[in-house]
């Protein structure tokens, strides 16, 4: 389950916190919780979210905290770690951290609002990251989020994406279960 966290500062919207995640985790402990933190200071929230049930703590390269210190803190808490890049950030900026990551998320829209149109430039980023992953023998998963639908999902998979985040395409579909099945079949 991709769980978006927004602080009203890094992005304009505000969403769920650690207490809601804790309730979800208690009700559905078998679910993998990919916690995507669109927040300015992910370091200070690592422990509360991981204790609440985060399976993967996924924060933005563009945050205000020290990236290495945050990665180290998440790993010390026994959690998988991911880094996310916004549409305006080059994938090469992730190079110093790639060998420490369990997941890299490429945003294909500006973070903070659902229902936006997919930015095709994300495909080049996915291709570069997939090539770098293969060249270096790394194991991180590649995830894409934003504007992913029946038309863009196959392009993302072809570019190297392992994980697709599709909110509006699923929850706005006449038959959400069929939309999930169609994407899972890719």
Where are each of the predicted segments found?
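Alpha-helix-loop-beta-strand connector modules within alpha/beta enzyme cores
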Residues: 14-35, 73-84, 122-142, 146, ...
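Glycine-rich, proline-tolerant flexible connector loops at the mouths of alpha/beta enzymes
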Residues: 1-20, 61, 109-117
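A short alpha/beta connector and helix-capping loop motif
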Residues: 9-42, 46, 153-170
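Conserved, mostly hydrophobic/aromatic
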Residues: 4, 49, 104, 129, ...
């Amino acid at each position: 389950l991709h769980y978006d966290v927004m602080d009203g500062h890094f992005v304009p919207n505000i969403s769920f916190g650690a207490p809601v995640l804790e309730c979800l985790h208690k009700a559905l402990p078998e679910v993998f919780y990919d916690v995507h933190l669109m927040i300015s200071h992910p370091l200070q929230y690592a422990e509360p979210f991981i204790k609440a049930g985060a399976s993967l703590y996924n924060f933005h390269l563009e945050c205000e905290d020290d990236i290495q210190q945050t990665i180290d803190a998440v790993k010390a808490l026994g959690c998988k770690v991911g880094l996310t890049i916004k549409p305006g950030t080059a994938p090469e900026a992730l190079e110093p951290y790639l060998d420490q990551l369990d997941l890299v998320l490429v945003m294909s829209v500006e973070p903070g609002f659902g229902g936006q149109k997919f930015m095709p430039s994300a495909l080049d980023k996915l291709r570069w990251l997939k090539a770098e992953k293969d060249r270096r023998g790394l194991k991180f998963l590649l995830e894409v989020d934003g504007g992913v639908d029946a038309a863009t999902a196959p392009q993302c998979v072809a570019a190297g994406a392992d994980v697709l985040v599709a909110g509006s395409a699923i929850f706005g579909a006449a038959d959400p279960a069929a939309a999930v099945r169609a994407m899972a079949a890719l």
